[in-house]
Amino acid sequence: SGNVAEAPKHYHCSYEDADIVMREWYHVWGSG
């Protein structure tokens, strides 16, 4: 997660990473 360069290599994890990113995004923007 967080490493765009690894996205193509670990594309099968994109959904898991997206879930983590969205949770972090919600935490940052949802609290502001």
Swiss-Prot record:
Highest taxon, organism lineage: Eukaryota
GO molecular function: metal ion binding; oxygen carrier activity
Keywords: Heme, Iron, Metal-binding, Oxygen transport, Transport
Subunit structure: Giant hemoglobin is composed of four heme-containing chains (AI to AIV), and two linker chains (AV and AVI).
Family designation: Belongs to the globin family.
Protein name, UniProt field: Giant hemoglobin AIV chain
